[in-house]
């Protein structure tokens, strides 16, 4: 899994001009699923995201997690995180998981996250418009194959 984690003051996702998910303070996740991803990768990602201390405490130190602050998560599927740009000028996306596998994996990932904090989400495979107000900005890239 490749996940871009952004600390946000707010974020929303719309499909065909209709808002389908919105959060206040929390995390915006751009989630890519690879063909070799396993339940172990999913559990690792959830554990890291829920416990990642990237929110400021009363002293201004990044010492609190999304769970600690009572934050929310907006999760967006994004197979383009597996883009291969080595040849030519058009990225290849053959490194991403096939849609049927990736869709189920993405559902399981969001279900697992939602047992810890409220999760809003986009629609897998849809053309989405994502709006966000970055906080910091703080952006972290998590690759479950690089641990």
UniProtKB/Swiss-Prot annotation:
Pfam families: Tyr_Deacylase (PF02580). Keywords: Cytoplasm, Hydrolase, RNA-binding, tRNA-binding. GO terms for molecular function: D-tyrosyl-tRNA(Tyr) deacylase activity; Gly-tRNA(Ala) deacylase activity; Ser(Gly)-tRNA(Ala) hydrolase activity; tRNA binding. Coiled coil: none annotated. Its EC number is 3.1.1.96. It is found in: Cytoplasm. Belongs to the DTD family. Homodimer. This is D-aminoacyl-tRNA deacylase. It comes from Streptococcus thermophilus (strain ATCC BAA-250 / LMG 18311).
């Amino acid at each position: 899994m490749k996940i871009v984690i952004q600390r946000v003051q707010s974020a929303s996702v719309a499909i065909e001009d209709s808002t389908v998910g919105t959060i206040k303070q929390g995390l915006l996740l751009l989630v890519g699923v690879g063909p070799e991803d396993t339940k172990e990768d999913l559990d690792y990602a959830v554990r890291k995201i829920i416990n990642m201390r990237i929110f400021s405490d009363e002293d201004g130190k990044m010492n609190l997690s999304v769970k600690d602050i009572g934050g929310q998560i907006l999760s967006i599927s994004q197979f383009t995180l597996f883009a291969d740009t080595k040849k030519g000028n058009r990225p290849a996306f053959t490194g991403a998981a096939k849609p049927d596998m990736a869709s189920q994996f993405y559902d399981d990932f969001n279900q697992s996250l939602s047992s810890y904090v409220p999760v809003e989400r986009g629609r897998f495979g849809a053309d989405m418009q994502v709006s966000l107000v970055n906080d910091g900005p703080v952006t972290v890239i998590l690759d479950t194959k690089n641990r």
